[in-house]
Amino acid sequence: MKWQNRFTWFKDWVGVSEAEFLNARHEYIHRLDNGHLAIYNRESNQVWPAGNFEVQSIGDLIQNVIIEKNDGSSKKCQPQIEIVVRRTEKALSHVDVAYLQSRAKPNSMFQVASNFNCAEVPSPFTDMSGGRFVSNNALDHTQGPAASASAGISLITRIHAPFFDPNIASSEWGQRFEKQIELLGEASIREHFPVENGKLIFTGKEPLEFELNEEQLQSVRIGIHKDAPVYFGRREGSSMEISDPMPIIDQVFVAALNRRAPLPHSQHLQSKTQFLLRAAYEGTYLAAILRKTEHLVLTFVGGGVFGNPIEDIAKSITEAHQKWSQHSSLQTVRIPIYSINAMKGDTNIALVLYETLQKGGIASDNITILYEDTPPVDCV
């Protein structure tokens, strides 16, 4: 088992610091013959594949599902839902996304709770082009940045080359304050959901009329990073494990309303919360159909510091599963719960989710709660 210093990973793998890389990214970012991007380390002559990132609207994804159904290739299936609960600190790896990604089975997809620019910026003022943003993801233990840093080379291209085009200046390839991925950028929803640097920041100037409809929902976009190599796993102290072997996974990037930030008009708080949760989970299941995913790992989007009600998240998971899983290739849907004993205050998240799934029509035979007390064997 080999380990990577979390403070120096960018330079160790790319050959230069992030700030140096940004000044000459055209020398380090290459397109491979399969169309995917890769990072070229000029010091070691190593090429690190980064997979392929794209943004798709829910409407476009639904069209793909309709095509699948029409050609008879969709199949009925009842995937097993596994809710994972750790009962001790030692069992952390069972619910830590970096570890889970590094042990992923083939055809796995991981949902990432991100922001509306597919970047785990901690604030509206964080400068992605400042020369440290990607590097610092490896130092953040929250699960969104942990998921991204685990597939660190893909993270580099998603932040610094989502607009890759060899025919334009390489300084225009990356995300910065003036140009970003916009999951809520469609004209029909933009005025209802004002975004600054990926963060929803309501000002009170939004339209007083907002009624959730299918057209608006289908305008929401999600980010899909296909064939992302998982270079790193669990963290210990200042180090992170180097994956061996190195799984190839898909990641889907979604976001939720932050109920601890400036809020929408009070009459819209619940409807906009539910609208974005529905988009997050339906979008994820649709991406899984697109990619013929067999093993899907979900997270409680908006359930941490964003303060979304656990009941709303559980309901959105249930409805998305019931609506779309029958069209998928899914064998398992795993939902790790990060907090010890799955508790958030006085609420047992696992039990709320289990009961919501059952009430939503999912048979108890298809739902399992896995309780973990000890670390995985390969972490002992």
Q: Where do the model's predicted regions map?
A:
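Macrodomain-like recognition of ADP-ribose-binding/processing modules
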Residues: 1-296, 300-380
